[in-house]
Amino acid sequence: MTIQQVLLLLLLWMWLLHPCRTEMLFRRTPDLRPKGFVGRTSGSDGKALHRQKRGWMWNQFFLLEEYTGSDYQYVGKLHSDQDKGDGSLKYILSGDGAGTLFIIDEKTGDIHATRRIDREEKAFYTLRAQAINRRTLRPVEPESEFVIKIHDINDNEPTFPEEIYTASVPEMSVVGTSVVQVTATDADDPSYGNSARIIYSILQGQPYFSVEPETGIIRTALPNMNRENREQYQVVIQAKDMGGQMGGLSGTTTVNITLTDVNDNPPRFPQSTIHLRIPESSPVGTPIGSIKATDADTGKNAEVEYRIIDGDGTDMFDIVTQRDTQEGIITVRKPLDYETRRLYTLKVEAENTHVDPRFYYLGPFKDTTIVKISVEDVDEPPVFSRSSYLFEVHEDIELGTIIGTVMARDPDSASSPIRFSLDRHTDLDRIFNIHSGNGSIYTSKPLDREISQWHNLSVIAAEINNLKDTTRVPVYVRILDVNDNAPQFAVFYDTFVCENARAGQLIQTISAVDKDDPLGGQKFFFSLAAVNPNFTVQDNEDNTARILTRRNGFSRHEISTYLLPVVISDNDYPIQSSTGTLTIRVCACDSRGNMQSCNAEALLLPAGLSTGALIAILLCIIILLVIVVLFAALKRQRKKEPLILSKEDIRDNIVSYNDEGGGEEDTQAFDIGTLRNPAAIEDKKLRRDIIPETLFVPRRTPSAPDNTDVRDFINQRLKEHDSDPSAPPYDSLATYAYEGNDSIAESLSSLESGTTEGDQNYDYLREWGPRFNKLAEMYGGGESDKDAS
């Protein structure tokens, strides 16, 4: 028997079973009912199935939802035993939907549904029925309550709350690992038939995932799914009611599943050998290059730690891991030298920092590579034999004495001669010099420890073939002390002796200082240059001495001052000594030795003024002198009224000739005769508001006879101003309206141009600005001139 035949038989059986199911649907269950009512039920075709007699249950009617017929759907029939069939009774219906959703025939008691009913909106309706006498309107039967229950049909498909689900599961998970659970709901009645019984199935996503039919739990179906091969999966789940049988309704949803990463891949170097280059002049800490091991994992599972585990350059280089790029940066640890070593080999290891113990069986999660670093030769500057030099020299050495030698060499393979020099910024007084060839430092000026005990020099070494690459080294010169300074009095002593002093009386304690600094400390000796009958010196042997009197009584009227030479010597080699003169005044003292007066003519001197009084007197004198000088200057100043108050004419030199007298000989204006002096004529005048870029040498031009020079001079100035209208006027204006003797410059009639003023139009001068207003008034008189004439 074929599948088609089986399906045909199944359909035939279901068709034959349908009327029986309908009849059972409307069958009433036995129950007590109000006396006198008889209920009739009908099938889907509206025909009466049977008549229920008294004692049968009639208070439940059953109605299929979603009726699609054109007529009202028949629900059932109410009938009373009091009904004779003559129309004397009237059936009344009240309750849920009465009169709108459900109507009753008043004469026959037939109940109909006026529209299609959805069980999902309401599953049952409670109504009340009553039979009354049509004429008296009195009930013939007590009111009875009944229920119309809506029978469900499979008219709702299962639905998922989410249209798209997102889930994740670790890669390499075992078969059956739960991923996510999806749940669908069906609005049909779960207590009636299989309309709400849902079965889940997978439409897309096999063979990677499966779903449990009853629960909707999605599980992995394949072992060792690798994220590195495929990361995203889309699974379509179907939910079907009727227990998944044919004819059931279904709904679908999409589940996007992502495989999350686990550390199942070790790091791998793409190359077994990596070559890097670095110049030998690179300082410590310079990055040489980066290496990177690739890891197919992501996130913390791909984090790698780099380290140098072997090689001949483990002490010369370091490697640092950069977390953001997961690269290993190799840096210089110690200075490199091409001439010492040119190639280094390192063995670098990369290892995962987070290892999952579940995947130890996949092998060690680390890898190694060989890094070869080539040192490149560069033209290095000279290298000194020391990082600094310290020379000690006595301050009394002769000029030109060598105090020390610095040494430097060219570290390159092709060694070049070295040239030495001193940085003069460190030896401004030029006390030292250096031999440029051998680096010997010698003195060029005398040394003095007392002026400067240390000299900090900077020596520069450069290759003769390449003077740009230089190296500096500090040289510290310490000046050693020699005993070249004699001791002196520590301070100036104002010593006096009382007239009533006695022999052996202490009048002064003296001490000395020495600029030298001997190793054993300073020791001074005090003595008198010659035996003195009045005073003596007693050495205290602690670098101090006492001045004592040798006799009784002194008179300031006889001798007011004594000079006592004291010899001070040191104990260093060679011994230095000096003689200091101590001035001792004779003073009058009281009985306790307090000085009262030290000058014999003190009583004859007038009382002196204090310092403050003297300063006040001087200030008064200065103020009086200043006032007198200012008054004299103001008296001599003459106030001159300007002829022209225009701000634009501040550069003009205007002289007024309105006095009567000898004519131009009495004026202070410049002599026009100088225009005929060839020495005073310049080829070109510079504008005053422009700073000349170059200096022009005056050029002499041959003088022209008569008035040609004046004409050429004026034409030249006019040409300059015509070609540069923005320049201020350079020439000075003077009016020559003289009476008296003839001018030594002869007649000015030669300055007259070939045309009259009427032929010229100088109105454009007014458009050049306020600086040319005066010229516009001179040359462009216009109507004012005509009116004046």
Swiss-Prot record:
The gene is CDH10. GO terms for cellular component: adherens junction; catenin complex; glutamatergic synapse. Residues 23-54 form a propeptide. This is Cadherin-10. It is a single-pass type I membrane protein. Keywords: Calcium, Cell adhesion, Cell membrane, Cleavage on pair of basic residues, Glycoprotein, Membrane, Metal-binding, Repeat, Signal, Transmembrane, Transmembrane helix. Glycans are attached at residues 256, 438, 456, 534. Residues 1-22 form the signal peptide.
